[in-house]
Design a protein with these regions (language model features):
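Ribonuclease/tRNase effector modules and their secretory precursors
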Residues: 1-99
Length: 99
């Protein structure tokens, strides 16, 4: 698997972003092609999040939020954990915390 980055999150868990997931997030046919300019912020959301919300129906999923003051929005980075490590599933901007 080709990896864009692997990072240790705020709670000490390894999380990676694969090339396949990055393509899914940023492709012109996706809902979030503007995310190509937010790679550094995605890393920051994982290491210094404003908030982490674990999904209520699936505790193997969490949303990491980073508030971007200049834009008045949150960057949401979705993560799924398998065998203790995580991988980024999605990333996009939102005006409010979703969960």
């Amino acid at each position: 698997m080709d990896v864009i980055f692997e990072i240790v999150d705020k709670s000490g868990r390894k999380i990676h972003l694969s090339k396949e997931r990055w393509k899914h997030i940023t492709s012109p046919s996706s809902l979030h092609p503007y995310m190509t300019n937010y790679l550094q912020e995605i890393k920051e959301a994982l290491t210094k999040p404003s908030k982490i919300v674990t999904h209520t129906l699936d505790n193997k999923k969490a949303d990491y939020y980073l508030y971007i003051k200049e834009r008045g929005v949150y960057l949401l980075v979705g993560v799924k954990y398998l065998n203790g490590d995580g991988f980024v599933t999605t990333a996009f901007l939102t005006r409010k915390l979703i969960r």
